[in-house]
């Protein structure tokens, strides 16, 4: 039996403590008057929005600690996946603290902080596919200029987020006029479609262009399909929230309703993404024993 060096044992034991301390330091370094907000100052949709910002911050932080603690419980080939999972929710927790502060102090559901978060975390979510299934299951299909599967996922995510931001901040109104919000939504959907075409859909309606399903380990098949379900079904919540964004001029603007939809979508998709990947990694690790 292989002997694990004592320093590596120490690192494994200290990782959870370091994770907790890191999250605590981040919280203290961003402390503001938002810490002392009184929930009694809110009612109705405003109260729900305030509540979900708080729950979002705490749940993302808890998920970060969980994924860091579980990283060494899976085989080495799946630890990158666990690292990505931790990064996604850790970065989200940091931004949710800021978004909660902006709402408490200024009454604003911040679009800018939201997209700062998405610009980092959504590409990481898309890259979860190649990190989980491994190089052996990735096809040789390429898109000219863009490249292979990982590049398509990355490009599609950035394209989607970029056009969404343009639509929600009114950047394209001078170019597209009153239809800017709708056109940006449609253009953003192109990036979403790219990821689905590359990674596949959960219903087996089309063969994925970037993944060879026959080469994916049996233990990972359920998790892979669950990730596809999040992409195809779970992400539908985001364009619904976009419709209520005040700057898009699509439906009657309601920043609280938009914020609630986005917060719920983030908690479901970001935490859920990591959980199903962890389940697959644990199952595949057990099969290797």
Predicted regions and their residues:
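A generic, lipid-embedded transmembrane alpha helix
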Residues: 84-102
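Membrane-helix boundary/juxtamembrane motif in polytopic membrane proteins
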Residues: 144-147, 180-185, 202-233, 255
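C-terminal transmembrane-bundle signature of multipass membrane proteins
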Residues: 197-202, 226-289
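Alpha-helical transmembrane segments in multipass membrane proteins, preferentially the mid-helix core
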Residues: 62-67, 128, 163, 190-218, ...
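Membrane-interfacial loop-to-transmembrane alpha-helix junctions, especially the N-terminal start
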Residues: 12-15, 74-86, 144-150, 224-227, ...
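Hydrophobic transmembrane alpha-helical segments in integral membrane proteins
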Residues: 34-60
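N-terminal secretory/membrane targeting signals
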Residues: 1-33
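Internal transmembrane alpha-helix with an interfacial aromatic "cap," most often the third helix
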Residues: 64-70, 96-100, 104-106, 115-152, ...
